[in-house]
Amino acid sequence: MLPQPAQSARHESIAGTHRIYHRNPGSLNAKDGLLGHGQRPLAALERKGIRVIQGAITAIDPQARAAEVEGRRLEADALIVALGADLAPERVPGFQAHAHNLYEAQAIPPAAEALRAFRGGQVMIGVFGVPYKCPPAPYEAALLLRGFFSERRVQADIEVFTPQPMSLPVLGQAGCDVVEGRLADYGITFLSNHQAVAVEAGEVVFTAGRRPYDLLLGVPPHRCPQVVAQSGLTDGGEWVPVNPRTLETKFPGVYAIGDVVAIPMADGKPLPKAGVFAEAEGEVVAERIAAAFAGGESQAAFAGEGSCYLEVGNGEAMLVQGRFLDTPAPQVTLLGPSRAYLEEKRAFETERLQKWFG
């Protein structure tokens, strides 16, 4: 939120109930159970002149460009909604009781403990709903776990399932063949078109059949935060529609960025939910607001360009990069694998944390 215009603008960041920023919990360092490297206290933003307000956001009034934080109403000249996607494991009966949630930071330590205690059998990694953030993460997890079990000489059969027709549809069939080929090379079974509807002790229930497991790691369904849905920003849909170039909502002076938005690509599929897009969108919105507050107009526009790394084991990574908003279709390529891409991946993560938090 930017409560005051022009030169005197003061930046406020509403942190919600979280005090700690977690980077990519779904990318799975669960085998170590170490989250510290990817964590930063949000209070560190105050060193950059950003005021962090701690508390649950209980209401959003987009017509007034206002938000309510635990009873305190905050009004602004510009409002940026960046509340992400909430995890909804409760939508799958039995998930919370039987699966380890790959995307919940607090669930990583118990998942790590379960992995260290595992002595062999069937491991399943499942996507329980789409869309979900960081689409490559389940496949990265499977490949890294293969290396983890091999180092420990643990005999594990690993399966990965998704309700989608291929691993990463945005890559097209050729790119998915490469990813799925890597899984096969590592002895990992890939199951497409598998929509899970429930989890029971020792079995995942699908729309057609069941499959057994001894250890289950899952990506739960995602949903728009309730406070956003109740505000009218979703316009009756599942996510917030925005101008794909300016990130403006239908309410003047109200923007939405990141996983909370729905931006269609030219092929009709939604833009993947990925941090690289949230960052680029945020930069566009910041430029446009700053220009407006100074009495001008910015031509900054979201280009839909981005890349992400997929760690694939053996000290290597692949690179997914593209122009996702191109017409008549997204232009997305898959490069690698190579050790250089893994080095780039680690450097990128470190640099981003340093840039944002110091």
Where are these regions (language model features)?
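Glycine-rich, N-terminal phosphate-binding loop of Rossmann-like dinucleotide-binding domains
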Residues: G71, L83-G84, A208, P220-P221, ...
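Flavin (FAD/FMN) cofactor-binding core of flavoprotein oxidoreductases
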Residues: M166, A301-M318
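A conserved FAD-binding loop/helix module that cradles the flavin
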Residues: I257-G304, L310
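A Rossmann-like FAD-binding core segment of flavoenzymes
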Residues: A9, A43, K48-A64, L74, ...
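C-terminal auxiliary extensions adjacent to catalytic cores
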Residues: M318-G358
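FAD-binding core/adjacent interface of flavoenzyme oxidoreductases
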Residues: I50-E140, G147-E151, L217
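FAD-site-proximal beta/loop scaffold in flavoenzymes
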Residues: G94-R119, E203, P212-L215, V219-A280
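Beta1-alpha1 glycine-rich phosphate/pyrophosphate-binding loop at the start
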Residues: M1-I50, G129-V170
